């Protein structure tokens, strides 16, 4: 089975999840991989796309030249991110890892129309969780069998055993973080811990303008932030897969998050899920100093993180590729 995989679809701060998937697919040996890039110049070993710069804006709308006409022979094409180029003679799989474009009213029609267009051509959309799948189905109004669930690859990271910071991952929930920050800062002072907020550039500006006294780190520094963490707090709007929280579990860092539908699906039993902001603070304090509880949290985290390792994602995608290829044209 020959698989064309777009390496430009990753949205993760810990690394390129599509490259991690590609490496795991090749290690598994279940397919012949053709790597390509829809939004950037081809790297060593990638298939070059003729007139890519011309077609790229069209592909963002699900239009333009069929991608399989620009690639070496493949049996299925897998893309992610914002580019959804059409295919002519082979099936297409589209991973949707960010739901914000479907939530934001000003952009909903464009993103929804793009996804409906590729589904109408026979594409299968991949959501990262059951909760995300339900949201995609509700927004697009398509048949349930057109949207499946495969979690993205979360990279394997070194263990963090001597971190001394309270690291807060803020993903699309900056106002929630600003409300929570004074309590986090107070807890950090009592624990003699730095409070680090890992955020986007826009969120960092909002936090600075609010006079919040925390150390700010950019998403590109996610690995460095995790290497300093003793406890991680995951603050998110639920639009993205909680890769940083899962990476923290893999690194042996106890993690706290609010008890939301997506967190209950993916993190329950491995992270501490709090019903309120006050509960978050109490969980942080206990996980900081309670060594027996930290040991239990690390063991549970390692077990859960294994479900999302690149090798697990590769196995799931190989099964999906086979199903889609067999069902093409039937």
Segments (PLM) and residue ranges:
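Carbohydrate transferase catalytic cores enriched for Leloir-type hexosyltransferases
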Residues: 1-330
């Amino acid at each position: 089975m020959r698989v064309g995989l777009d390496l430009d679809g990753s949205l993760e701060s810990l690394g390129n999840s599509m490259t991690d998937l590609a490496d795991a697919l090749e290690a598994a040996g279940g397919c012949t991989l053709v790597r390509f890039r829809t939004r950037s110049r081809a790297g060593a070993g990638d298939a070059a796309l003729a007139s890519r710069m011309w077609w790229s804006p069209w592909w963002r709308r699900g239009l333009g030249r069929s991608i399989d006409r620009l690639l070496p022979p493949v049996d299925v094409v897998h893309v992610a991110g914002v580019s959804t180029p059409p295919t002519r003679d082979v099936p297409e799989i589209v991973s949707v890892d960010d739901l914000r474009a479907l939530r934001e009213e000003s952009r909903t029609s464009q993103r929804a129309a793009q996804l409906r267009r590729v589904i109408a051509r026979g594409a299968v959309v991949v959501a990262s969780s059951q909760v995300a799948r339900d949201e995609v189905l509700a927004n697009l109004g398509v048949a349930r069998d057109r949207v499946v669930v495969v979690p993205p690859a979360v990279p394997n990271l070194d263990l963090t055993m001597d971190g001394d910071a309270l690291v807060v991952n803020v993903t699309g929930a900056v106002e929630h973080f600003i409300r929570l920050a004074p309590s986090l800062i107070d807890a950090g002072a009592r624990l003699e811990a730095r409070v680090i907020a890992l955020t986007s550039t826009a969120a960092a500006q909002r936090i600075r303008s609010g006079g919040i006294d925390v150390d700010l780190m950019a998403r590109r520094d996610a690995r460095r932030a995790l290497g300093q963490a003793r406890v991680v707090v995951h603050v998110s709007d639920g639009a993205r897969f909680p890769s940083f929280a899962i990476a923290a579990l893999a690194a042996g860092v106890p993690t706290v998050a609010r008890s939301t539908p997506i967190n209950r699906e993916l993190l329950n039993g491995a992270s501490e899920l709090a019903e309120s902001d006050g509960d978050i603070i109490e969980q942080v304090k206990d996980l900081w100093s309670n060594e027996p509880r930290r040991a239990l949290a690390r063991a549970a985290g390692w077990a859960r993180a294994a479900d999302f390792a690149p090798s697990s994602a590769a196995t799931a995608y190989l099964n999906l590729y086979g199903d889609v290829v067999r069902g093409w044209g039937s």
